[in-house]
Amino acid sequence: MRTVLLTGFEPFENEPINPSWEAVRALDGERIGDAVVVARQLPCVFGAAIDGMAALLRELKPAIAIAVGQAGGRTEMSVERVAINVDDARIADNAGAQPIDTVIAAKGPAAYFSTLPIKAIVRDMRAAGVPAAVSQTAGTFVCNHVFYGLMHALATPAGEGVRGGFIHIPYLPEQAARHPGEASMSLESMVRGIRQAIATTLATEVDVREQGGQLH
């Protein structure tokens, strides 16, 4: 049986919970097709988060690795297209670090694309009743940091054949209640969307070709 690694983050920026961890841990141990889900939490800390991801890849040897993170203010599940090789933190991480214009991997490329079937995932999430879209930026905080670190690891011989990517999710309703005017999504919808992302990835070797870009 194949393994699907899901990661979520600990809370950050004074939030008592992080929806990414709440959503992925709800799927821990679940069987989807011929795969079993293993969910693990990463620290919201530059460096340590990539180290944690690398250790999980070595330990679990997953067929698929999907990192999930909170993006307060987004209105739908965002299936990320690209990770960029820069840290530029608007706020400090949970260890107090705030790197600015810092390269993630000195010998790494400027960017990596997700190897998930991102457009098929969005199509199937929407068909399952979950608002979703392809996103062209994962930001420059710890989410992008982990996304880049994941894809950098999968670009090595040890990562050959492993598919990886990143999904951002909105606030939970109880978080949005503390941020008037911000969008939210129920935990049930988040879990359903991530489950669908896994099922679609397992079933899709070549992504669909359909519109998923933005003008700005």
Curated annotation (Swiss-Prot):
Chief location of this protein within or outside the cell: cytoplasm
Gene3D superfamilies listed in its UniProt record: Peptidase C15, pyroglutamyl peptidase I-like (3.40.630.20)
A GO term from the CC aspect: cytosol
EC number assigned by the record: 3.4.19.3
Active site per UniProt: E80, C143, H168
CDD domains (alphabetical): Peptidase_C15
Superkingdom of this protein's organism: Bacteria
GO BP term (any one): proteolysis
Subcellular localization: Cytoplasm
PANTHER family: PROTEASE FAMILY C15 PYROGLUTAMYL-PEPTIDASE I-RELATED, PYROGLUTAMYL-PEPTIDASE I
Homology family: Belongs to the peptidase C15 family.
Subunit relationships: Homotetramer.
Described function: Removes 5-oxoproline from various penultimate amino acid residues except L-proline.
Protein's UniProt name: Pyrrolidone-carboxylate peptidase
UniProt organism field: Cupriavidus pinatubonensis (strain JMP 134 / LMG 1197) (Cupriavidus necator (strain JMP 134))
Lineage start: Bacteria, Pseudomonadati, Pseudomonadota, Betaproteobacteria, Burkholderiales
